[in-house]
């Protein structure tokens, strides 16, 4: 991607999805090198944005692709289309099981959220959270979001949950 354009970022502190990249490339794929060694697109500066495409480099594992698409790519595409892309709504739910988490990165664990007759929400994982376990995404109705500095979660602790649109039930 560096040869075709500019890398905005590469690798993020999240799991799954760490090897995600975002950048801009010249629409015609051509770059010019200035005498000082700085790259620029072959288009004039006034046409620069129109002649550049945004490139999302997604991870290789299917679950990591789905998580990064849901968390980053979908909102970006909606904004680019002129739609109002609001930040995903985070609900709070009580964890039905202990969750292991090391501080230092944000984790998105696939979860099954249940709304009880009294209105309270609980969540449990779909089981194995490996980024290649596609069935974990198929079973989930949301993502348990464990923040960057957060550690382990005990049964009954409140956690943030990002729902897949309207899937509580």
Label every PLM stretch briefly:
Residues 2-169:
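Flexible glycine/proline-rich
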